[in-house]
Regions:
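Conserved beta-strand/loop scaffold segments within soluble protein domains that form the structured core
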Residues: 91-254, 258
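N-terminal amphipathic, basic helical "cap/leader" segment at the start of enzyme domains
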Residues: 1-134
Length: 258
C-alpha cells in the first residue's frame, strides 16, 4: 500500500517508474534478509524493522541556521546538499550547475534534459538481489546528484549532509545518491549523518519515539584518470540504524577512491 501511494503522482511511462515497479516486485519475492544470509548472519536485523516504520513524513521541519551550521565542515567553503529527515532543504544548501551538476536527484530523475545520463548510469551497478538495495530503488525520492564533466576539477569539496531533526518518529528514510566523474575529473565528497537530539532518548523523555531507519544507496561511476576522495561520517544517535550500500564502477585507469 505504501508503494502504491508513493507512486500515485508518478509518470507511469517513465524509466524510473519501471525500475521502482520491478524492484518492489523482486523485494516482495526476496523479503528482508535473515541469519541464513551470510552477510547478515550476525546482525539481528529484525530488531530495527519496526512495523510502525513509514516512508511518509507528516510535515517539513524547519531548523535554525545556528543548529545546522554545527554540522558543516569548519572553516571550509563547500558545495552543500542538506537533507533534513530525508527532505531537501534549499535554505541551507549550496548547489550549482556551473561547470558541473551538484544538485538534488529528484530534479534530474524526471527531467528530459538528463534522460540520457539517467538511462546510462542510474540503477546500473546495484545488486538486484540485495534486499535493501531493492527497497531503496522502490522508494528513494531524494538524495544527491553529482556529475563532474571531463577534465573538470572542482574548486571546493561537496558536502552531503543528512540531519535527523527528532521532530518525527518511525521514519524509514531512503536517500539515494548518483555520482559521476568523467575522464580526468577530480572531486572531494563528504557524506555525513547527524542528529539534533542527544543520545539520552528514553520512553520517558520522548514517549512513543521510534528511531529512524536510514537505508542509503550510492552509485559511483569513476571514468579513466578521474580522482575521487569520498568520506562517510556516521555521527547520528547511538540507537539509530543506518544501512549503507555503496556501489562503485571504476574504469581500468581510474585510481581507487580514498
Amino acid at each position: 500500500r505504501q508503494f502504491l501511494a508513493f507512486e500515485l503522482d508518478a509518470d507511469i511511462n517513465s524509466d524510473v517508474h519501471d525500475i521502482r515497479s520491478k524492484s518492489i516486485k523482486e523485494f516482495e519475492k526476496i523479503g528482508f534478509p535473515d541469519k541464513k544470509h551470510e552477510y547478515w548472519k550476525y546482525t539481528p536485523i529484525k530488531k530495527v524493522l519496526n512495523e510502525k516504520l513509514t516512508i511518509f513524513k507528516k510535515k517539513r521541519h524547519l531548523i535554525e541556521f545556528e543548529k545546522v551550521k554545527d554540522f558543516f565542515l569548519g572553516g571550509i567553503e563547500s558545495y552543500k546538499i542538506v537533507l533534513i529527515d530525508g527532505m531537501y532543504d534549499p535554505l541551507w544548501s549550496n548547489t550549482t550547475h556551473k561547470g558541473a551538476d551538484i544538485c538534488i536527484l529528484s530534479s534530474v530523475l524526471e527531467n528530459e534534459k538528463y534522460s540520457n545520463v539517467i538511462s546510462k548510469y542510474f540503477n546500473k551497478i546495484i545488486d538486484d538481489k540485495e534486499s535493501f538495495s531493492l527497497l531503496n530503488s522502490s522508494f528513494s525520492k531524494e538524495g544527491a546528484y553529482i556529475h563532474v564533466p571531463k577534465n573538470v576539477e572542482l574548486d571546493k569539496p561537496i558536502e552531503i549532509i543528512h540531519i535527523n531533526s527528532g521532530g518525527e518518529s518511525s521514519l524509514m528514510l531512503q536517500p539515494r545518491n548518483l555520482i559521476i566523474l568523467e575522464k580526468g575529473s577530480k572531486a572531494q565528497i563528504v557524506e555525513s549523518h547527524y542528529s539534533l537530539i542527544g543520545n539520552n532518548i528514553s520512553p520517558y523523555t520522548f514517549p512513543g519515539y521510534i528511531d529512524p531507519l536510514t537505508n542509503t544507496l550510492t552509485e559511483i561511476h569513476v571514468e579513466e584518470n578521474a580522482n575521487l576522495d569520498y568520506y562517510k561520517i556516521q555521527n547520528d544517535l547511538e540507537t539509530t540504524s543506518i544501512i549503507d550500500n555503496t556501489y562503485i564502477c571504476l574504469l581500468y585507469t581510474s585510481p581507487s577512491p580514498r
